[in-house]
From Swiss-Prot:
GO terms for biological process: cytoplasmic translation. The gene is rplB. This is Large ribosomal subunit protein uL2. It comes from Burkholderia multivorans (strain ATCC 17616 / 249). Residues 38-59, 224-257 are annotated as: Disordered. Keywords: Ribonucleoprotein, Ribosomal protein, RNA-binding, rRNA-binding.
Length: 275
């Protein structure tokens, strides 16, 4: 994997920085593990915009990822590493001894030809998946389940990981990259090691068109709108917002907490915020 600064042949390429990985597969993905997906452009089933700044972008198939890793005791060989346009992490195509192929999130350090295992008897090695009750305290883990059998939900993006801090009864404490400490049931599964493609954060898009390829539309400032469109809008000429920053619906932004999921608050031992 290499960081490549593009030759400045145009203003759009002057600031562009790419992450090049020559180990990735250059052919087509495994057809049996592809699914179609249509662009929603941020609209819900009524056609109303529920998520702004989405639309357009290149069409691509969804790669069906195995987030459960439930084929216990069956060794799997890494056939190849692939790029996935749906996520920041790379993915690995693994071939199980019974002939089945699956995609998984590619862990850091896992190479083509390496053998992976899952289950409570799997060795503590990068890429292997075990129940948290069988993982030693202090181990770096990723792809962590929040409910047993539901599939990995935490620490799945490029370069992320968590640390297993302690086990108390039927729960374990896990520290995430954000600093948050959460309780997780010991029957939940996690994968040893970190997620690969850790240099993803070093890339520079370089130009607005590259974001349009990814389906990201422009973000218009509130002060550039009319009063009917945003609380910051209006005024003669260039004017300040005239109030503390808020969203288009009047909710304070820039640090204002909006989390209201009281049902899972008991699972958070320490919040990521300092105060």
């Amino acid at each position: 994997m290499a960081i490549v600064k593009v030759k400045p042949t145009s203003p759009g390429r002057r600031a562009m920085v790419k992450v090049v990985n020559k180990d990735l597969h250059k052919g087509k993905p495994h057809a049996a593990l592809l699914d179609t997906q249509s662009s929603k452009a941020g609209r819900n089933n009524n056609g109303r915009i529920t998520t702004r700044h989405q639309g357009g972008g290149h069409k691509h198939h969804y790669r069906v990822i195995d987030f459960r890793r439930t084929k216990d005791g069956i060794p799997a060989k890494v056939e190849r590493l692939e790029y996935d346009p749906n996520r920041s992490a790379n993915i690995a195509l693994v071939l199980y001894a019974d002939g089945e192929r699956r995609y998984i999130i590619a862990p850091k350090g896992v190479t083509v030809g390496q053998q992976l295992m899952s289950g409570s008897e799997a060795p503590i090695r990068a890429g292997n998946t075990l129940p948290i009750r069988n993982i030693p305290v202090g181990t770096t883990i990723h792809c962590i389940e929040m409910l047993p059998g539901k599939g990995a939900q935490m620490a799945r993006s490029a370069g992320t990981s968590a640390m297993l801090l302690a086990r108390e009864g039927v729960y374990a404490q896990v520290r995430l990259r954000s600093g948050e400490i959460r309780r997780v049931h010991i029957e939940c599964r996690a994968t040893i090691g970190e997620v690969g493609n850790e240099e993803h954060s070093l890339r520079q898009i370089g130009k607005a068109g590259a974001n349009r390829w990814r389906g990201i539309r422009p973000t218009v400032r509130g002060v550039a709108m009319n009063p009917i469109d945003h609380p910051h809008g209006g005024g003669e000429g260039r004017t300040a917002a005239g109030r503390d920053p808020v969203s288009p619906w009047g909710t304070p932004t820039k640090g204002f907490r909006t989390r209201r999921n009281k049902r899972t608050t008991t699972m958070i031992v320490q919040r990521r915020h300092k105060r």
